[in-house]
Amino acid sequence: MLLSDRDLRAEISSGRLGIDPFDDTLVQPSSIDVRLDCLFRVFNNTRYTHIDPAKQQDELTSLVQPVDGEPFVLHPGEFVLGSTLELFTLPDNLAGRLEGKSSLGRLGLLTHSTAGFIDPGFSGHITLELSNVANLPITLWPGMKIGQLCMLRLTSPSEHPYGSSRAGSKYQGQRGPTPSRSYQNFIRST
């Protein structure tokens, strides 16, 4: 069941759904707008000949921060990681779904490639997979509304929520844009 603005405010007021910093003006009829933080991870195209999800490639990305007050410029065809300004803490009976903003999508900005689902129990900043599919550069301003988070109530609380020892929670507690950790549980078929 998708939560309404009333349900979202009730979950936040009760302390079950944590959002820091929280701004009530960001609550929409059935979602919460999320804002862009000021840190980005850009890919180092000269360090590796290819990306291998089975290997730890520590120098695949570099953390960058625009000069105070300046935007990050995302060029056509580029892909970078960003993150939400807000830190989210989900209870064991709520899951999240990150969606883009329609106005930004109409400019050619994709907010996530595939990872729009947030498990119950997750706590941290949400990493954004930002792509420019337009034919002009797009300026990304820290603090701008970048997406919206919908919350879904589970039919029962999760038995092993994200962050529990059985969940394999490699991104629990992440701060800022976090690079892939696919190598940690990569399985090769024989």
Curated annotation (Swiss-Prot):
Site features described as Important for bifunctional activity, chain residue numbers: G116, F117
SUPFAM superfamilies in the record: dUTPase-like
Metabolic or biological pathway: Pyrimidine metabolism; dUMP biosynthesis; dUMP from dCTP: step 1/1
GO BP term, pick one: nucleobase-containing small molecule interconversion
Assembly notes: Homotrimer.
Active site per database record: E129
Polar residues: bias regions: 171-190
Database matches in InterPro entries: dCTP_deaminase, dUTPase-like_sf, dUTPase_trimeric
A Gene Ontology molecular function term of the record: nucleotide binding
Modes of activity regulation: dTTP inhibits both the combined reaction and the dUTPase reaction.
The entry's keywords: Hydrolase, Nucleotide metabolism, Nucleotide-binding
Keyword Nucleotide-binding carried by entry: yes
Keyword Chloroplast: no
Gene3D superfamilies assigned: 2.70.40.10
Pfam families in the record: DCD
Residues reported to bind dCTP: K101, S102, S103, L104, G105, R106, D119, T127, L128, E129, Q148, Y162, K170, Q174
Name under which the protein is recorded: dCTP deaminase, dUMP-forming
CDD domains: trimeric_dUTPase
Region Disordered, annotated ranges: 160-190
Function: Bifunctional enzyme that catalyzes both the deamination of dCTP to dUTP and the hydrolysis of dUTP to dUMP without releasing the toxic dUTP intermediate. It also acts as a dUTP diphosphatase. Affinity for dCTP and dUTP are very similar.
Catalytic activity annotation: dCTP + 2 H2O = dUMP + NH4(+) + diphosphate
Family in the record: Belongs to the dCTP deaminase family.
EC number(s) given by UniProt: 3.5.4.30
